[in-house]
Amino acid sequence: MSDPVIKRALVSVSDKTGIVDFCRELSLLGVEIFSTGGTLKTLQDAGVAAASISTITGFPEIMDGRVKTLHPKIHGGLLAVRENADHVKQALENGIGFIDMVVVNLYPFEATVAKPDVTFEDAIENIDIGGPSMLRSAAKNNESVTVLTDSADYAQVLGEMRAGAGATTRATRLMLARKVFALTSRYDRAIAAYLTGAAGAEVEGAAAGMTVSLEKELDMRYGENPHQNAGFYRLTDSEGSRSFGACFEKLHGKELSYNNMLDIAAATSLIEEFRGEDPSVVIVKHTNPCGVAQADTLVEAYRRAFSTDTQAPFGGIIAFNRPLDMDTAVAVNGIFTEILIAPAFEDGVLDLLMKKKDRRLVLQKQPLPKGGWEFKSTPFGMLVQERDARIVAVEDLKVVTKRQPTEEELSNLMFAWKICKHIKSNTILYVKNRQTYGVGAGQMSRVDSSKIARWKASEVNLDLNGSVVASDAFFPFADGLLAAAEAGVTAVIQPGGSIRDNEVIEAADANNLAMVFTGMRHFKH
């Protein structure tokens, strides 16, 4: 069978990128173009010859455009097998002309439901019905019909048509058909996921079944290590669509790596804890915070965060909860950093920071999506859990010691607790004056984490006398608390829940420590 020459095309797109030039070329190749609604107007306004789909169907677009292509003369023209004599006969008897090309992309459902203020009505109106129907009909009949959903394919198709006397190759039609079914499958999963969330049904535990759609958004140079392939995928589930581009824009620097993406997630998840609060700075290395501070100015917050660990920030990631100003930019510019993330960059700051070509500058355009599910792959399946997004307020704290914490201690305890859950377990964190003084992360023994945190503080001459300590899980024995008391701690925040809580409380009282229980553990693995 020879490749069919394209004589008639149906064009209806929501994304009009390149469509005028593409259709102009089709017209020059002798293709008759039919279109709908806004696409038809766009083509006609640009001087491209195109007729309304109604000239094929003999029926107007009705119900606010909900019904325009759902017609036998459309789908018969797409699905007819050209080598089947009965199909050809029935087409002639019913006045059905063959349609050789479909150019359709769908209503932007995923982009619509990703908007924080989207209404249910807006979401429903952006569920495309006619588009997927035409795409599936055309893709099913890919022996005869060329179907395009992506403007990136326009050039290849035009090239083949010029070289092939108006026809595309079988290999290209098959490739394009595969893209259609991948698109419609993802589109339907996104709708199902949104409606699942919109239903508002209370589910005890994780749902028995989940529908998750992944679409590659960014290529990664490599994975965690150079021998590993990797990519970044936008995710759509029952909570909506989540993508890098919705939250961030890379303004400068090399392409982002797999490890960069992990660090961006870690840094911004932590800086979100301080949204709307005093100027705050988070410095992250290998997804662990190595310095966090709040102050009256951003530059002072940076200097204090940096002073927690003056080595780890080199090659690290820094996130700010305020627009990055010139004073802070000058201070940061003194060291090599992989990535700087801010909600805005004040005048002149980008000019200064862009002088270092290897540094990535990332604009955080909006807050991170709240809640949702967290997925972790294992060699034997997928773990799914709610994100650790619950907030502990001051009124949730239970004072378990004889001494109540002072206002200053309470402020530092709450500051420490916000940070603690973002550090790899086991975690011991020393805080003083709204600044991390010692970070003990990722140790198998809680006592070892405490020793490391104390050692890190001593390395940079930070005095732990008068500090507070946070532990991501309960102290199983009093030894960890006694080590903190020996370091000069005056107050403690921890979940509680150990069978030896009374022993730990007695040790706190014996050392005149104030201790509060949160009732919430924050393991992080």
From Swiss-Prot:
The EC number(s) this enzyme carries: 2.1.2.3, 3.5.4.10
PROSITE patterns linked: MGS (PS51855)
Ranges where the MGS-like domain occurs: 1-149
InterPro entries according to UniProt: AICAR_Tfase_dup_dom_sf, Cytidine_deaminase-like, MGS-like_dom, MGS-like_dom_sf, PurH-like
Keywords, in A-Z order: Hydrolase, Multifunctional enzyme, Purine biosynthesis, Transferase
Keyword hit for Transferase: yes
Pfam families on file: AICARFT_IMPCHas, MGS
GO MF annotation list: IMP cyclohydrolase activity; phosphoribosylaminoimidazolecarboxamide formyltransferase activity
GO cellular component, one term: cytosol
GO terms (BP aspect): 'de novo' IMP biosynthetic process
Catalytic activity line of the entry: (6R)-10-formyltetrahydrofolate + 5-amino-1-(5-phospho-beta-D-ribosyl)imidazole-4-carboxamide = 5-formamido-1-(5-phospho-D-ribosyl)imidazole-4-carboxamide + (6S)-5,6,7,8-tetrahydrofolate; IMP + H2O = 5-formamido-1-(5-phospho-D-ribosyl)imidazole-4-carboxamide
Pathway entry: Purine metabolism; IMP biosynthesis via de novo pathway; 5-formamido-1-(5-phospho-D-ribosyl)imidazole-4-carboxamide from 5-amino-1-(5-phospho-D-ribosyl)imidazole-4-carboxamide (10-formyl THF route): step 1/1; Purine metabolism; IMP biosynthesis via de novo pathway; IMP from 5-formamido-1-(5-phospho-D-ribosyl)imidazole-4-carboxamide: step 1/1
Domain commentary: The IMP cyclohydrolase activity resides in the N-terminal region.
UniProt similarity note: Belongs to the PurH family.
NCBIfam families (alphabetical): PRK00881.1, purH
Protein name per Swiss-Prot or TrEMBL: Bifunctional purine biosynthesis protein PurH
Species annotation: Chlorobium limicola (strain DSM 245 / NBRC 103803 / 6330)
The encoding gene: purH
